[in-house]
């Protein structure tokens, strides 16, 4: 097997898809089931109560930046420096001490002074215990970052997702019990979070406990700190960009406005969930191809287009069916005004995803020292806009300020990355998907206005109006096709998929043909597996003696891997043709 094929076998599209799907499934199910708690929160908590919860969680996120010390990044960076088990165990041990002793000191001091701190944040007394419970949850959550990061570094997505499912199984019922049965309100939510984090942390200890040396490697610790601490400043200015608007809303509008904005933020999270799943698997996937820069650039460009298409499609669906989304996930009428803010925040997350895509070039060229500067510029713009417009316009101004900040951040990141590692991103296709999304959302709004749709109407009327708008959602793929979004290679693969679907009704004939080609692998009593059918089609279309040999070996795992290589070859060839100018 060639070196190229060996590399592909260890880190090809199959690995990216598998890891993204598994990480994403765990995260998305967790977020989905957590979203199911939103009707509970909006029924048992007032907007003001939800605002208190939002302020507690945002403040905890700020504290997390200081407590983490950037060691999540350092862990990933130094773990691969020494490929021996002993060397990696030293890294794990250092991370363990940073995740336990240092946070215990910092969080303990904050807990002592929290009555005074919370009095300033909330403009009144009586909130200290809420924040102290959140600090306890932060301690165990930060500690559990060690095993969860280790699962990802060692490509154990199933184990990672098992803990995500366990979080759901514990946190959801416990929160429902405390909020509904014991009427504990915000306190019940925070207790449920803390108990869940403690339980998961305790359960994860056996997965790495034997690898701890309990002796700090001082020299290694100095290097890790030198690498990690600069990231703290970046994280702080990034916090300002993403979350500081809550403090402005609290200052000028109060807890109720913070609660509504927090609701809108929760409703806008589907795109963020997709980005989180993708960013967990994407870096280790494309960095494995750096030995061939031209190939690496093509693969990054094409895969980022598909990722952005997913994000834009999710934003489009959110915009089209916003009234239904609000009515399904919020209970009280006092929460139903968050639609416009939700859509704007979803757009800001799409821009955040674009920033993440553009970051590749700076990472490859090791030019990340400029990231704190450009993040500070974007954050300064965000703060300035918040100061100028939040006092008058409230949460919609906060949302648009976030959009402006992320737009500037993405633009600056693109400029830095392209200067040092030029990637031919598919700008024409990105613009086309943006135009298609905008026109689709505009059409949905026009239909809503024409039919008199109102989010405050009886639920049956809302459902009826959403049915009127359902065909509008089809505009998005139709516009993509009309605008020439698809490349020739993609149209060819779609046509091939359509041919396969048309052949499926004739299953006996297909099975017989498979039996003739594959021998005992396909009979009426033992029909071909879906993977075998893919291999047969790949062999027929790829051509050549080597491919026919692969099809003949279709029974085992080796063939599955080789067939995946053929599939990836087709993808790479299509990407290369497109980048060579066959399409725009």
Labelled PLM ranges:
Residues 1-16, 186-187, 202-242, 281, ...:
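Interhelical loop/hinge segments that connect adjacent transmembrane helices in multipass membrane
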Residues 2-6, 446-541, 547, 559, ...:
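Membrane-proximal transmembrane or re-entrant/amphipathic helices at the cytosolic face
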Residues 2-3, 72-75, 149-153, 157, ...:
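C-terminal transmembrane helix end/exit motif
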Residues 3, 11-73, 103-114, 172, ...:
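Signature of the first transmembrane helix
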Residues 19-34, 167, 189-204, 208, ...:
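Transmembrane helical elements of multi-pass membrane transporters/channels
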Residues 80-97, 260-376, 497:
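Specific pore-lining/lateral-gate transmembrane helices of multi-pass inner-membrane transport
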Residues 114-134, 255, 319-350, 456-460:
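Interfacial segments at transmembrane-helix termini and the short loops linking adjacent helices
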Residues 128, 132, 161-209, 227, ...:
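Hydrophobic alpha-helical transmembrane segments
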């Amino acid at each position: 097997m060639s070196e190229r094929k060996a590399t592909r076998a260890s880190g090809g599209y199959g690995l990216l898809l598998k890891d993204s799907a598994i990480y994403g499934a765990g995260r998305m199910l967790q977020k989905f089931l957590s979203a199911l708690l939103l009707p509970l929160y909006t029924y048992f908590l007032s907007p003001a109560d939800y605002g208190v919860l939002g302020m507690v969680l945002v403040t905890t996120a700020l504290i997390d930046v200081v407590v983490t010390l950037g060691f999540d990044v350092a862990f990933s960076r130094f773990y691969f420096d020494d490929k021996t088990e002993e060397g990696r165990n030293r890294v794990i041990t250092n991370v363990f001490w940073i995740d336990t002793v240092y946070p215990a000191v910092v969080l303990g001091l904050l807990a002592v002074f929290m009555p005074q701190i919370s009095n300033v944040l909330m403009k009144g007394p009586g909130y200290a215990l809420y924040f102290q419970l959140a600090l306890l949850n932060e301690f165990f959550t930060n500690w559990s970052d060690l095993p969860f990061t280790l699962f990802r570094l060692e490509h154990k997505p199933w184990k990672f997702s098992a803990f995500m499912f366990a979080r759901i199984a514990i946190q959801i019922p416990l929160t429902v019990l405390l909020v509904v049965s014991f009427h504990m309100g915000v306190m019940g939510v925070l207790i449920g979070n803390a108990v869940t984090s403690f339980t998961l942390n305790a359960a994860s200890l056996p997965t790495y406990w034997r690898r701890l040396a309990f002796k700090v490697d001082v020299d290694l610790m100095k290097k890790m700190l030198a690498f990690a601490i600069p990231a703290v400043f970046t994280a702080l200015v990034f916090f300002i960009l993403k979350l500081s608007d809550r403090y402005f809303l609290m200052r000028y509008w109060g807890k109720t406005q913070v609660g509504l904005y927090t609701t809108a933020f929760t409703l806008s999270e589907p795109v963020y969930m997709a980005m989180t799943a993708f960013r967990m698997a994407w870096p280790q996937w494309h960095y494995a191809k750096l030995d061939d820069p031209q190939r690496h650039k093509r693969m990054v460009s094409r895969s980022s287009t598909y990722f952005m298409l997913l994000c834009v499609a999710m934003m489009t669906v959110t915009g089209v069916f916003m009234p239904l989304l609000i009515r399904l996930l919020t209970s009280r009428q006092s929460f139903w005004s968050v639609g416009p803010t939700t859509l704007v925040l979803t757009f800001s997350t799409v821009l955040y995803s674009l920033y993440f895509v553009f970051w590749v070039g700076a990472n490859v060229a090791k030019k990340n020292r400029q990231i704190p500067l450009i993040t500070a510029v974007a954050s300064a713009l965000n703060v300035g806009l918040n100061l100028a417009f939040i006092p008058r316009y409230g949460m919609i101004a906060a949302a648009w300020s976030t959009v402006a900040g992320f737009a500037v951040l993405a633009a600056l990141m693109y400029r830095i990355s392209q200067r040092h590692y030029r990637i031919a991103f598919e700008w024409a296709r990105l613009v086309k998907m943006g135009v298609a999304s905008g026109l689709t959302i505009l059409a949905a709004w026009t239909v809503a206005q024409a039919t008199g749709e109102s989010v405050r109407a009886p639920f049956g009327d809302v459902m009826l109006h959403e049915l009127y708008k359902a065909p509008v959602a089809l505009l998005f793929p139709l516009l993509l096709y009309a605008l020439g979004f698809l490349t020739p290679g993609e149209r060819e693969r779609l046509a091939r998929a359509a041919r396969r679907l048309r052949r499926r009704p004739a299953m006996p004939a297909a099975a017989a043909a498979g039996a003739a080609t594959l021998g005992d692998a396909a009979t009426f009593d033992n029909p071909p597996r879906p993977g075998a059918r893919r291999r047969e089609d790949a062999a027929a279309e790829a051509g050549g003696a080597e491919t026919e040999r692969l099809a003949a070996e279709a029974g085992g795992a080796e063939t599955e891997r080789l067939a995946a290589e053929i599939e990836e070859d087709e993808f790479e060839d299509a990407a290369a043709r497109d980048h060579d100018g066959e399409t725009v």
